[in-house]
Amino acid sequence: MIETIRKAWKVPELRKKLLYVAFILVIFRLGNNIPVPFINTTALQAYFNAASTSILGLMNVMSGGSFGTATMLALSIQPYINASIIIQLLTVAIPPLERLQRDGGEAGKRKLEAITRYSTLALGLLQGFGYYMLIRTNGFLSDTSVWAAIVIIATFTAGSVFVMWLGEQITGMGIGNGISILLFAGIISRLPSAVFYMYEGAKNWAAGKESGGTDVVLHPVMIPVFLIGMILMLVFIVYISLSERKSPVQYAKRVVGRKMYGGQATTIPIKVNMSGVMPIIFAQTIASIPATIAAFVPSMSDSTFIRLFDTTSVIYCVVYALLIVGFSYFYATIQFNPVEVSNNLKKQGGFIPGYRAGRPTAEFLSKILNRITLFGAIYLAIVAILPIVTGAIFRISALAIGGTSVLIVVSVALDTQKSLEANMMMKQYKGFLN
């Protein structure tokens, strides 16, 4: 990745794009530090430290910590991600939207993007109101007037729309997917606080305390163990992210005039983790609904149902893993349609050796997809569940979303690297591929 950036920096046009991305990221980080008035951020931050394993903790990590301090960009990319998920689901369930996506071309793509923007605005308003109610219910407001409510909700909503706009600027004028890069920047910005968290835990152990400022006691010997474990997880995630099953494709020869065309061989790559991190995000959102309800309605926090779905309970982990498997299959079928791929091969005169074009090819690809997706789903479940179990055993809540964070960072880094390489190939800089 660093070598790719170094080579891209030598290309004037790509250097401008990289500088533009850096400029947008500076604005994004500045916005993450502008406080919203009328909120006791110290008490709110302590509350989020206690709720770090819930969906609120995940939102705080994905926002770069701004959600836990109620800054102007507290909602960050969450409304946009939720809007994108909803639109993806609706394009499968509603035929007109499906036709618009499939047959609409560039105009259809722009219409879906406009729908996603308006949905982001609506969800930003809804989540801004919900966040305001969370802050108000727990007594973190210095002013409970209607005017204060309007200012707070409007600021949160405007911040979510502004983040969406920043992401679109990176996508249009920079490198890679803008929203993903903002998500990457938010997670990376939490790295210093995670290091400090582990340092405080070791210091508390040395002092013989039961708890400290970070509410954790950590044996110093465990710090290198966790670091080695994180490195091994990073290597594992990179390896699986780059793994794919290649099915050979042969194209029939045809004669046009005096020349012969076709006959070349290629492959159809099917990635092990085709759906990326989306199954984890969506599964955690649903599995954490009881804990989120308890956060917004404190009177329900002692109910048996809420306790059963505590984010460190066995039931939560089982439901979470099953949801990840289910959504992995769902997103895999959205991104790779065996019937559509088979029909396209048939139209282009291609076939998979040993299988007739049409239905046999579709059945073969579907069989391969199901097997690959099962392995990918189990891999995602392990990445998501293992840090939760480890964090519960060693009483380190910050580990609970460590696997998800590493997976997001790796996925975005690899996608951005591919985007840089594609831009360099367009400029005929291919030496880095050797």
What are these regions (language model features)?
Residues 1-434:
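N-terminal cationic and glycine-rich segments that engage phosphates or anionic surfaces
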